[in-house]
Swiss-Prot record:
Keywords: Glycosyltransferase, Transferase. One of its GO terms (cellular component) is cytosol. PROSITE patterns: THYMID_PHOSPHORYLASE. Homodimer. It holds the Pfam family Glycos_transf_3. It is an enzyme of class 2 (transferase). InterPro entries: Glycosyl_Trfase_fam3, Glycosyl_Trfase_fam3_N_dom, Glycosyl_Trfase_fam3_N_dom_sf, Nuc_phospho_transferase, PYNP-like_C_sf, PYNP_C, Pyrmidine_PPas_bac/euk, Pyrmidine_PPase_CS. Belongs to the thymidine/pyrimidine-nucleoside phosphorylase family. The keyword Transferase applies. This is Thymidine phosphorylase. The lineage of its organism: Bacteria, Pseudomonadati, Pseudomonadota, Gammaproteobacteria, Enterobacterales. It comes from Escherichia coli O139:H28 (strain E24377A / ETEC). Gene3D superfamilies: Nucleoside phosphorylase/phosphoribosyltransferase catalytic domain, Pyrimidine nucleoside phosphorylase-like, C-terminal domain, Transferase, Pyrimidine Nucleoside Phosphorylase, Chain C.
Amino acid sequence: MFLAQEIIRKKRDGHALSDEEIRFFINGIRDNTISEGQIAALAMTIFFHDMTMPERVSLTMAMRDSGTVLDWKSLHLNGPIVDKHSTGGVGDVTSLMLGPMVAACGGYIPMISGRGLGHTGGTLDKLESIPGFDIFPDDNRFREIIKDVGVAIIGQTSSLAPADKRFYATRDITATVDSIPLITASILAKKLAEGLDALVMDVKVGSGAFMPTYELSEALAEAIVGVANGAGVRTTALLTDMNQVLASSAGNAVEVREAVQFLTGEYRNPRLFDVTMALCVEMLISGKLAKDDAEARAKLQAVLDNGKAAEVFGRMVAAQKGPTDFVENYAKYLPTAMLTKAVYADTEGFVSEMDTRALGMAVVAMGGGRRQASDTIDYSVGFTDMARLGDQVDGQRPLAVIHAKDENSWQEAAKAVKAAIKLADKAPESTPTVYRRISE
């Protein structure tokens, strides 16, 4: 038996906590026997004193074990359970292609996803732009879809890592969100509750990233790889670029449309293709579905070329109560905005810089995201045909096409786009899409 205040005191004085002390505290958060003040105090001591790697692993495992941990053994699946987690960005629609692509190659992806947060789009919000799409199937149905289709993308239920929800809510109001051990535990508790064999982390870098600097993004990626492997899940991370919108579109229905076009081969944005392929390669290698990069890429290209990946996406949509012919007739089902019109730069030039975060916030302002949890989303709004860094723009080539609910909203969005995109006389040097791979 421990006392919460003694655990706080020990950490306050700079000592490492034991696994038992951490589990006691986290179970108390779940059971409401630890007060909000005590959670805040421990969070602040961790913020200032950091945690050792064993402490980080213990914290993550305790938070994972505060609720249900999925177990897939009874399904006798003939492939690995793998998933991807992204720290979030703008136009980051990789999950919608990656899940079906890896499933078509023999993996099983029980993806528990989130809603939009701040300027970043949420995978669940995107999928809910598909009529009827059910993001909360019951446990048995979730398992059936994984067994039959190979991939399902669902929302987090209250039974998964419940301690994290309360811990995060307190961190949010006490300026302790940006602590690497706490971020690591929060992300991984939910992911490891999926019962994974392997995980790949997509840690964004740049103006639209969650972490403000390259160094902090790198530190987070290294922490996650260290902790997840310490918890027994094969994990690698990629540092990928978010200095511009990743896809050609940003929003909800517009990104789903781009995902379908990507899978069918109708249109593939080259940067989106690079990042999606790189993440899929990691999943195939970590999941032992491919021995090396070349074999993984060949398998992934094959399921894109032969239509298998698109077929898996269609089956997932149908299994989650969406239209059975969605891939073939997506244009018929996805909502369209009242006003669709291009915005042009005031001068000619080359796109040299993009405030990706501001573009994400512009989508939120148009109604494509939430300012508070109770807000409803307008799934039809957003941007398409986004100019990329290095593109030449003028009176013929727009900065973006804006999908808005009315003229007033379009004008506000146009102002935001012009302010967020800087032009120069010559094209900037191109930046990589993937900066670095981090493994144990």
